[in-house]
Amino acid sequence: MKPTDFSVHVTTFLTHYLAAQRNVSPNTIKAYRDVFTLLLRFCRDVQGIAPERLRLEQIEVSLVEAFLDYLERERRSAPSTRNHRLAALHAFFRYVQSEVPDRMLQCQKILAIPQRRHARPTVGYLSKEDLAEILAQPDLRSRGGRRDAVLLSILYDTGARVQELIDLSPGDVRLDPPAQVRLMGKGRKMRAVPLMEKTVQLLRDHMQENHLDRPEQFDRPLFRNGRDQRLSRSGIRYILQKHVGKARTKRLSLNRTVTPHTLRHTKGMHLLNNG
C-alpha cells in the first residue's frame, strides 16, 4: 500500500522538522507525538477511518473541532490540556501550509480555530521565613540529605524549571567568580544564571563529594538517583514534598500546596520585592 500524504508529512514533521529545523526539545516532540496518537485513535474509533487510509484532505476544521470536543467530553481533558493539543495541531498545519501550498486555505482555517479561554490558577509564593524552613530540612549528615540541600537551593536560587534542573550536568556549572549555571530552557534557549555564595559552597561540596569536578564527569548528571541516573520529574517532586512536609510541622503558615514552580515564582517575587 502506498503511504498516504498525511503519514509522510506527520513523519517528517516529528522526526526531522521539529528537531533539525526548529530545534525543539525531545519533551516537546514527545508531547506532539502523543497528540497525533490521540488523533489517529479518534479517527479510527470514532470516525471509522483507519490510520493507513487517513489522508491530509480529510483533516478539515470539522474533524479537528470534533476531535477537540471528544477530548473534553470523553477523555475529560481540561481546557488547558485541550489548548495544548490544539497548539500541536496548529504547529503541524503551519508547517504543512509551506510544504503543500495547494492546502493553504485548509491549513489556515484550522489555524483560525481559537484557543479556549479559561481561568488560570494563581501561583502563590513563599515568605522568606517559610522558604528558609524548607531549605533547612535536609539532613546534612547523610549523603542524600546533602544532595537534597543543594538541589533545593539551586531550584530556588536559579528559578529553574524542573526539566532544566534534570538536564543539568557538571559542565553547566561555573564555580569561579562570577559563579553561575547554564540552563537549557524552552525553545532550546540557553541562559546563564548567577548563584548566591551559599549555593556555590553547597554545590562545590556536592561536586567534590561525588567526584563531579573532574573533566571526564562533565556530561554526567549533576543530580542522580539511586540507580546512578538523572532524577525524574516525579523524583524531584518527591524530594520537595518530603522536606515541605517536615517544614509544615514547624510553621503553620505552610498550609498551601508547594510545587517546584512555587519556588520559581517565589524567586521572582523576592527579586521584585527587593527592587
State what each model feature region is.
Residues 1-275:
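Conserved catalytic core of the tyrosine transesterase superfamily
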